């Protein structure tokens, strides 16, 4: 079957939730038995978000094949079973750099390179490539209609719709329908102007998703349909909800999936949302709660740890618990002391880069170890736990990471200079390597030690988890730390790189070099997070 396309755009304001809406629609279509993928097209000039500040852009989501991508791809994977790859996210920077590379190589035979057709052709080519083999491809365009940056992307999608045929394409536009308290009514004019903006570049939306803090009244939906040239049944009301996992059912209740299947002439089963109903039941009926302290350096923007936040919620679903996350700036631990860590049921230190706040994280790991507080360290969270143990248990005073102190006597964490990737190829890095795209990225095998807590949680000898880091445990100094009692319970496929450490004689202290949050989903959870939240609950009862 030829691929059908749903192009998702946004209007009026940003941050309306295009990614959540696209993922929710994909979840319904998948529940109807269709093979669905989702792509995100980002108009910014960065080649990828890998070197962007988390406080500006939010987290960098790492795919199975090692792409550093937009956090929306995390939403996609949490809503559907399809695994995202490098083909599912590209930026204007990536498009332009590829076109310029081809021009330098002589691929265009001396032609004058222009936005149309060369940039738009490259965009179309990547969309078609990413959609190949799927029944439905949902393509989300970042930004807001009217932005200069997004014009080449919208023009490319307009052309693609003409080329593949309008019977195989749907334009779905998210727009804001604000409620004005003084008038006591919702206002449709911003939506009308947003559609007018789309029409000015040759795109007639087929579906309007109207975001508001309440359901849009039928008379206002009819008004929007009339003035925006859209069937009334294709004007969908998407109100604010307490949980994003309610949205698939909300869209289905208004017949959005029926409209799309009829438009594409797809003969498929009714959507079975029983898995999502179970998720919502677990979420609405907790049997208790826990408070997890997340100690990091980007705590002013929770989206910087989006996948970790969601993974903790998923672990709450697994354990029928409400997980309350208390964000703690690691610099506050340095200045205010460890008292701010009291009354926490569990402590989590997520990944991060740079020296700022590191000593606060080391203090936090020490507090968790010495006070028997369940601890989960991720990436840098494992490295600070290793440094802390080396300093205070192994007696290696001044132990540190060469990332933070290149002249320290005991660089227990050091730059990876050579390792094997998933295909068995040797990757080499040095201090002179570029920051962008030079880390150990993507899914890597990890071999677990039998009898360890990690082995017990995973129930497997070999696991596969995603990585994003440059620094590793220094194998030259590692034996001294292990001799002091620290357990290395997970190793890379070649048995050279430390993947998991555990502190013995502690209720629950596990730290991993990889990022387990990237593979956690609301329907399946993740064994590490589930075990951590369970341990936190048991600690709360003491």
Swiss-Prot record:
Give every Glutamine amidotransferase type-1 domain span.
291-542
Q: In which pathway does it act?
A: Pyrimidine metabolism; CTP biosynthesis via de novo pathway; CTP from UDP: step 2/2
A Gene Ontology CC term for this entry?
cytosol
Query: Does the keyword Metal-binding belong to this entry?
Result: yes
Sorted alphabetically, which keywords does the UniProt record give? ATP-binding, Glutamine amidotransferase, Ligase, Magnesium, Metal-binding, Nucleotide-binding, Pyrimidine biosynthesis
In terms of Pfam families, this protein maps to: CTP_synth_N, GATase
Q: Which Gene3D superfamilies match?
A: 3.40.50.880, P-loop containing nucleotide triphosphate hydrolases (3.40.50.300)
What are the binding positions for ATP in this chain?
A: 15-20, 72, 239-241
Task: Give the function comment from the record.
Answer: Catalyzes the ATP-dependent amination of UTP to CTP with either L-glutamine or ammonia as the source of nitrogen. Regulates intracellular CTP levels through interactions with the four ribonucleotide triphosphates.
The identity of this protein, by name, is CTP synthase
Q: Which organism is it from?
A: Histophilus somni (strain 129Pt)
């Amino acid at each position: 079957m030829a691929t059908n396309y749903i192009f998702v755009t946004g209007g009026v304001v940003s941050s309306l939730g295009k990614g959540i809406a696209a993922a929710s629609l994909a979840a319904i279509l998948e529940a109807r038995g269709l093979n669905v993928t989702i792509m995100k097209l980002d108009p910014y000039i960065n080649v990828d978000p890998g070197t962007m500040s988390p406080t500006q852009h939010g987290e960098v989501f790492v795919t199975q094949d090692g792409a550093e991508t937009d956090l929306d791809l995390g939403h996609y994977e949490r809503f559907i079973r399809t695994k995202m790859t490098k083909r599912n996210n590209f930026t204007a920077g990536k498009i332009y750099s590829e076109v310029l590379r081809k021009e330098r190589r002589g691929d265009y035979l001396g032609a004058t390179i222009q936005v149309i057709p060369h940039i738009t052709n490259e965009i179309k080519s990547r969309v078609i490539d990413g959609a190949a083999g799927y029944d439905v491809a949902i393509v989300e365009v970042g930004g807001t209609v009217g932005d200069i940056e997004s014009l080449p992307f919208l023009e490319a999608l307009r052309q693609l719709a003409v080329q593949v045929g309008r019977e195989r394409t749907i334009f779905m536009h998210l727009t804001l329908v604000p409620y004005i308290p003084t008038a006591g009514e919702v206002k449709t004019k911003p939506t009308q102007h947003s559609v007018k903006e789309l029409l000015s570049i040759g795109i007639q939306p087929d579906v309007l998703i109207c975001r508001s803090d309440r359901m849009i009244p039928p008379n206002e939906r009819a008004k929007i349909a009339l003035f925006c040239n859209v069937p009334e049944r294709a004007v969908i009301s998407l109100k604010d909800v307490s949980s994003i996992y309610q949205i698939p059912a909300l869209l289905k209740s208004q017949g959005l999936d029926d409209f799309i299947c009829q438009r594409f002439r797809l003969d498929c089963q009714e959507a079975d949302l029983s898995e999502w109903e179970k998720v919502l039941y677990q979420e609405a009926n907790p049997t208790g709660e826990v408070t997890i302290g997340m100690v990091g350096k980007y705590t002013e923007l929770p989206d910087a740890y989006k996948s970790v936040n969601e993974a903790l919620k998923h672990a709450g679903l697994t354990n029928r618990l409400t997980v309350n996350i208390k964000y703690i700036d690691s610099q506050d631990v340095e200045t205010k002391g460890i008292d701010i860590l009291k009354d926490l049921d569990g402590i989590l230190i997520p990944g991060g880069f740079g020296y700022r706040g590191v000593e606060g994280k080391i203090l936090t790991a020490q507090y968790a170890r010495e006070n028997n507080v369940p601890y989960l360290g991720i990436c840098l969270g494992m490295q600070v736990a290793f440094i802390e143990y080396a300093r205070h248990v192994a007696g290696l005073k001044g132990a540190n990471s060469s990332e933070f102190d290149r002249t320290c006597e005991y660089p227990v964490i050091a730059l990876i200079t050579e390792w094997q990737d998933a295909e068995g190829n040797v990757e080499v890095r040095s201090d002179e390597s570029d920051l962008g795209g030079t880390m150990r990225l993507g899914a890597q095998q990890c071999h677990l030690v039998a009898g360890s807590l990690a082995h017990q949680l995973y129930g497997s000898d070999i696991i596969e988890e995603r990585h994003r880091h440059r620094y590793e445990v220094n194998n030259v100094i590692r034996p001294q730390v292990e001799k002091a009692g620290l357990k290395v319970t997970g190793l890379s496929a070649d048995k050279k790189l430390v993947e998991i450490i555990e502190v013995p004689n502690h209720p629950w202290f596990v730290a991993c070099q990889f990022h387990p949050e990237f593979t956690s989903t609301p329907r399946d959870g993740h064994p590490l997070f589930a075990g951590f939240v369970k341990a936190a609950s048991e600690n709360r009862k003491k």
